[in-house]
Amino acid sequence: MSVNLGPLAPQLSDVKRNPQADGLGYNPRCLRRDINRNAAAVTTSNYTYDLITQNDNLYWFQTTMEGEFEKGKWGVHAGGHYTVSGDPAGDFYVSPGDPVFWLHHAQIDRVWWLWQAQKLEARLKDVAKTMTMNNQPPSRNGTLDDVNNMGVLGGDVLTRDLMSTLGGMGGKLCYIYE
């Protein structure tokens, strides 16, 4: 299997930069892995169990899930990406080109669902953090009434309509994990 597009800033020294400055040039290459045991250590079932059961509010659940990089802590989400790493998984901008990206994100969604289901009524209305990744640039806090542009797949959808995977509260999603 091969991928192309990206990397804009390759993390592996022998991966050539994209031939176009905008990163959209044709540059096929084979998938590669660079397994990182340190990252894998924070993705174990014990770590994930603690994530789900030891974080009572959304702010800390999200912070623990994502990781606190300034403190040298990787979370389950970042740990999953860096466990596989390599090319393209280690390139932030093109990592969705790696099939493992989708398996990893299905698990992240499932962990969110398990955490949310513990106090479903309250957590369907719980929003934390700001509108930008790592609050860069600084931005206001998110709300249930914020619009999420899903592009051609779904148009504009309010955050409140994405809070339940069960289609409740007028939601757009309709699935359950067994």
Where are these regions (language model features)?
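C-terminal accessory segments of proteins
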Residues: M1-E178
